[in-house]
């Protein structure tokens, strides 16, 4: 849908808005949910080692992850330390990674279909009609997406990079 909307955008401003919206979806789903999964994994490993899970130790883990994920260009202030406390995803353990993998799979599927890859659309229809007949990872293989490799995530990150470059051109030129 986003690719269609970008093609139909009537102005540079509209295109910039759409690109920003999609980039934020990418950031929130692929990067942020991966960071949440890493936080959750680190907290559970800490508990498994018999270490106490205090607010202070969890804040420290979360702060460091924010610094690692967002890098030196972003100021990581003290308020972010407590964000983990209000994230309801942590009530149900070990599922947030599915947002990032699902988003990556969707990007891979749509890229194959949009590029006209032979069999991509038919594979997607088989995937959809497969329902719950197979494990999701096997259903995805029907449309050419192998989540047992890094390829879908690598492709999604490559596409993210392309979108950033397109966004930069859009806001810095008079296209």
Language-model segments: residues:
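C-terminal, non-catalytic "cap/extension" segments appended to globular domains
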Residues: 1-13, 37, 43-175
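Short beta-alpha connecting loops at secondary-structure transitions
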Residues: 18-25
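Hydrophobic transmembrane alpha-helical segments of multi-pass transport and channel proteins
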Residues: 26-31, 93
